[in-house]
Regions:
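Conserved SAM-binding loop
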Residues: 61-62, 80
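Glycine-centered small-residue hotspots that permit tight backbone geometry or close packing
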Residues: 63-64, 86
Length: 124
C-alpha cells in the first residue's frame, strides 16, 4: 500500500491546493520501505485520484483541504487525513502507529450527512 502526503519540500503543505509535490510512501507490513517525490501535477483532481488509485494509495495526508477536493478522494476510498503539520515522514509514521494499534482515526467520514444525503462529511 502507499500513503500520499501533500508537501512543500519535505514538510506537509499548509494548503493542499498550494502543495509543491506529493510524497508517496510505500508501506509493507507496517514499515516504510520506499519514498518517492512527485511534482504536484497541473491536472484536475479526478485525474490525480485515478493515478493514486492505480498506485494503490490508501490515504492522503494533508493540512487544509477544501471539501470538494476531499470528496474526490473519499469517493475513491482513499482516506483523507487532514489537519496534519510538520515533517511528512513523521506524519506517515504517526498515521501508521495509530492505524496499526487501532487508535482513533485522525479523520473519518460520516456517510449519514443529514444536509446532503448520500454525501460524505469529514470529521476531525
Amino acid at each position: 500500500m502507499r500513503i500520499a502526503v501533500a508537501c512543500s519540500g519535505l514538510d506537509v503543505a499548509y494548503r493542499f491546493d498550494h502543495a509543491e509535490n506529493f510524497t508517496l510512501y510505500t508501506v509493507t507490513n507496517g514499515i516504510i520501505v520506499e519514498c518517492q517525490s512527485l511534482p504536484y501535477p497541473s491536472v484536475p483532481q479526478p485525474a490525480i485520484v485515478d493515478f493514486f488509485k492505480s498506485m494503490d494509495v490508501v490515504a492522503l495526508i494533508c493540512n487544509t483541504i477544501n471539501i470538494e477536493d476531499a470528496r474526490y478522494y473519499c469517493n475513491a476510498d482513499i482516506e483523507v487525513v487532514a489537519a496534519v503539520s510538520g515533517i511528512a515522514r513523521t506524519a506517515v509514521e504517526q498515521y501508521l502507529t495509530k492505524t496499526l494499534i487501532g487508535a482513533d482515526e485522525m479523520c473519518h467520514w460520516d456517510d449519514d450527512d443529514d444536509d446532503f444525503p448520500g454525501e460524505h462529511t469529514c470529521h476531525l
